[in-house]
Amino acid sequence: TDAGRRTKSTPTLLLLKRSSDTKHTRNGHDSVRQWSDNFANRLVLSLERMLPNYNVVRFSDRNSTMMACHACQMRAFHSAKVVIGMHGAGLSNILYMNPGSAVVEFAPYANDARCLPGGGPFSRLAAVISHHYMMHHPPTEEYKWTAGRTSEFNDTRFATHIRNFLASIDFL
């Protein structure tokens, strides 16, 4: 949920959501990088099921209050233990996360050098700040296109991949 279920002992996982029709979204024409609100809600639910010890918070470009408050964005990223986002969807804000946090970059295109570990800006930034980094790239045949210029993919497989990554770095 946008508000999440915040407690001091529950680590926060931020799920960055891009929309095709907000003033904050660049590349609004790139439907593979946009998720509908309905699909984003399904992703949150899948992540909550797989990661019950995390406070899963949707960080959306539709939240105009958050988008207008840079200090609020910095605080949100600083308090997150895990950030998951589409390539370019505000991932530069991982700069404000604590060292040793986890970053998952969703890479929608095969063989895109911007997303290759060590070759893309976010994997390099994660390395410099000592974040754990993982890239998720769903198979092309897994994508579904919606009428609203958005994409969907297998949310259960995605959440399982995230859980396995977090288990591998002792974040569960």
Regions flagged by a language model, labelled:
Residues 1-172:
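The feature primarily captures lumenal catalytic ectodomains
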